[in-house]
């Protein structure tokens, strides 16, 4: 039942709905999700590294925690060729968090040649990229002009690198024909659909940033290692982003990912039972 609850948690099912469906207590569901999120974060730190960076895109998701006045942003970074979700940062939309996301990406991945990096027009990206990635990437921005929530014009800016270098990078890209943020925007839609906390116009929201970050760590593990990606399908063989990036040889299951967690859980339960039994036997000895 543990893996079923986690599976529902990464498919947009709120805790209250999970309680009604599985007929278990709210506290049990919340505790299982919290434990799974902690383990998923450690799993990501251990497994999500050593891949080659071919093409990057970054974007943000706007949401809130606690109440609608406490706006936070979820910064995501995507490796386009493998569709690997590399980094996530929850917090304010500022230079510090963007810098944190870029540094995390650099620490996890390997750079074999200058890669293409595309973001939206937020100026903090330009500052961070020119300080951290000068000489290792070709950087451009895609700026969408809107009127009444409709895109009326798209402007593309090349801010790092030459036009010939951009053309060469696009020639080698298997996905992009021009500067775009389409892949990370579609990825962010997948995140919104999978997290009850990020749904628009919903009463379900995270109580604090830690809960939201835990949810994102759990979803990152599921997206990269468990969930098959249809864009990576090869014939009848379905693949995950981690398989495409060469991090694992097969699609993992929740049971495989959480094997160590299950072992620790059963050992902890057994130890607790032994302590209770020893305590009861000792109390009986002194009564005699």
Predicted regions and their residues:
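Residue-level recognition of single "structural anchor" positions
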Residues: 1-270, 274, 278, 284-288
């Amino acid at each position: 039942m543990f893996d079923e609850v986690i599976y529902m948690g990464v498919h947009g099912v709120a805790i209250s709905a999970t309680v009604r469906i599985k007929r278990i207590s709210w506290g049990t569901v919340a505790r299982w999700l919290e434990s799974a999120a902690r383990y998923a974060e450690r799993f990501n730190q251990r497994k999500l590294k050593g891949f080659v960076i071919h093409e990057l895109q970054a974007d943000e998701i706007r949401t809130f925690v606690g109440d609608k006045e406490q706006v936070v942003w979820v910064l995501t970074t995507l490796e386009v060729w493998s569709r690997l979700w590399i980094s996530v940062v929850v917090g304010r939309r500022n230079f510090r968090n963007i810098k944190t996301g870029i540094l995390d990406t650099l620490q996890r991945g390997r750079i074999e040649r200058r890669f293409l990096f595309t973001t939206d027009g937020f100026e903090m990206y330009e500052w961070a990229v020119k300080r951290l990635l000068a000489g290792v990437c070709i950087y451009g921005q895609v700026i969408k002009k809107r009127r009444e929530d409709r895109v009326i014009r798209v402007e593309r800016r090349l801010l790092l690198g030459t036009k010939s270098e951009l053309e060469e990078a696009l020639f080698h890209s298997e996905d992009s024909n021009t500067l775009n943020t389409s892949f990370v925007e579609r990825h962010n839609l997948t995140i919104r659909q999978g997290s009850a906390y990020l749904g628009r116009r919903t009463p379900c929201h995270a109580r604090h940033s830690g809960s939201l970050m835990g949810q994102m760590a759990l979803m990152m593990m599921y997206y990269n290692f468990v969930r098959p990606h249809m864009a990576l399908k090869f014939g009848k063989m379905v693949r995950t982003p981690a398989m495409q990036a060469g991090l694992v040889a097969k699609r993992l299951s929740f049971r495989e990912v959480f094997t160590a967690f299950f072992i620790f859980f059963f050992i902890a339960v057994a130890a607790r039972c032994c302590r209770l039994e020893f305590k009861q036997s000792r109390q009986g000895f002194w009564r005699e």
